[in-house]
Amino acid sequence: MSRDIFMKRLRLHLLFDEVAMVTHIVGDVLSSVLLCAVVLLVLVGNTLVVAAVATSRKLRTVTNVFIVNLACADLLLGVLVLPFSAVNEIKDVWIFGHVWCQVWLAVDVWLCTASILNLCCISLDRYLAITRPIRYPGLMSAKRAKTLVAGVWLFSFVICCPPLIGWNDGGDGIMDYNGTTATPIPVTTTQTPVTGRDDVLCDNGFNYSTNSNMNTTCTYSGDSSLSTTCELTNSRGYRIYAALGSFFIPMLVMVFFYLQIYRAAVKTISAYAKGELKTKYSVRENGSKTNSVTLRIHRGGRGPSTGSSVYRHGSTYGGSAAGAATREGCGDKDAAGGRRFGRQEMDSHLPVRKCRSSDASLVTLTGLKCEIIDNGNAKHGPISELIKGRGKSFFWRKEKKRSVGGERESFENSTRNGRSTRAKLCGGRCLAIETDICSSGECSPRTKRIKEHARATQHNSLPVTPSLSSQNEETDAVFVRGTSNSEYKPRRSRLSAHKPGHAMRLHMQKFNREKKAAKTLAIIVGAFIMCWMPFFTIYLVGAFCENCISPIVFSVAFWLGYCNSAMNPCVYALFSRDFRFAFRKLLTCSCKAWSKNRSFRPQTSDVPAIQLHCATQDDAKSSSDIGPTASGGNGGYT
């Protein structure tokens, strides 16, 4: 009878063992598939990022220096750390020896910290690009970017090296970067089961045997010399040091930079909303039709926007100005007060660089008032009084533009009722000049050639490239439409001016690209916090409470941090058109042909050229060709 009971218990015990074994196998298979998928995503995704930048010159920007460095850190993590972590997680025992345990853990923290600090550098780069667009090329040059990259790797090593030189919890085992100990596992252990049950299971990698006394003996089935486990040490000081240096301080830095980027975005949108004011009407003066000036101000600097007040006060006069025939030089002072101006002073006047001339007269347009210097005699007063009977001219200014080619100049000529207009960029800003070219109906041969050239080209616009670029260019620009009572209607060119709101739309399109980059940065930072916050929180809690965290929770948080290295390339592919295009080309094996067909364009090539024309409302549908000196290839000036 007792023997039958013993056999029933034995069969029940074997059934429980089989169920537990099947469950354990299924769990191992699912864990293996999931962990292998993470490892493959890290390897493939970051390899694509590095290959995309290597094969596309368009992607070789300063920002992408940090992105490539981030991808390299994650790629090395996928090669040197993750495969061993996956095996250790699945087998639940370290089988690669004591020495590699130490190296593996040190490399793990080094690469993880480098990945986190690279995200911090990307946030810094975007912060400078968006909040300081003019100074950005000087602040974040290629040399400084490489210096930051070197600093990332050096600081990461400083975080991982203290345990290697003795900062640990005093244990006898091998210390890793976090002070983990590699402890040998006993070859055999004896466990006493619960009374009446003999379903004790051994750890993974051990075999069990049950004797007649119902005691279970677990015996390691592998090489006893390799049976080690790498466990985190309880060195409280180092855990705090590593958690702050590897995660919490970089996280605060990234959050600060992103908040500043968000504030800059909101501020710029508000400035554009205030600057997009339009006045369209006409008045009768002495029986002739006079059109009002339409002025837009786009502000990109600090301080409150004053563009709208400038517009309201300066949009009621009809703007026409006569000027000098010969330009000899440019000054650095504004026309009204003889002093430099700030962006916040636009509500009082519209500054330009005064162009000195050797003869005739010079006109400088400054807000409500105009100054005419006629053969050395200066006259001040409203524009409508000073320009009566002088015909049509126009004025516009553009802040200095930094570009690869440096400062450029552009000229234009046009003919209005026997008068020639010639405009030239003056130190980055432009003043339109109008002069008489014929006297008593007689024109010199040179003058005739000028007139013929003017009629042939009929220039009435100057190309400019104002933008919100975070890389190279200033964002202040003022556009003024002049007035005329002439019947001049130049022919339209496909490169000429567009409708009044076109410039604003182009500005906003460029700014939308900047907002998209900021949104991508927000997603990257959010993914970073979501992935690493659980692990480092548990890591700190473990320093004060050893048994508060279950092994399963620790493993999930541990691998969630690794998932961040797999998510970064996915974010680039989803939100970056250039990276998405490069990935598609690489995956379709057409990288070589694509690289040959793609010509190099600097990062500012995305900025569209804006052609502005100067015409009355009667001529709203008219515009002219771009002059022979204007470059249509890059949206700039020759």
Curated annotation (Swiss-Prot):
Keywords linked to the UniProt accession: Cell membrane, Disulfide bond, G-protein coupled receptor, Glycoprotein, Membrane, Receptor, Transducer, Transmembrane, Transmembrane helix
A Pfam short name: 7tm_1
PROSITE patterns: G_PROTEIN_RECEP_F1_1, G_PROTEIN_RECEP_F1_2
Chain residue ranges for the region called Disordered: 618-638
Residues annotated as glycosylated: 178, 207, 215
UniProt note on tissues of expression: Expressed in the central nervous system.
Primary residence: membrane
Cytoplasmic topological segments: 54-64, 125-147, 260-520, 576-638
Function: G-protein coupled receptor for octopamine (OA), which is a neurotransmitter, neurohormone, and neuromodulator in invertebrates. Activation of this receptor by octopamine induces an increase in both inositol phosphates and cyclic AMP. The coupling to adenylyl cyclase seems to be less efficient than the coupling to phospholipase C. The rank order of potency for agonists is p-synephrine >= clonidine > p-octopamine = xylometazoline = phenylephrine = oxymetazoline > B-HT920 > serotonin = p-tyramine > epinephrine > norepinephrine > methoxamine = dopamine = histamine.
Protein name per its UniProtKB record: Octopamine receptor 1
Organism of origin: Lymnaea stagnalis (Great pond snail)
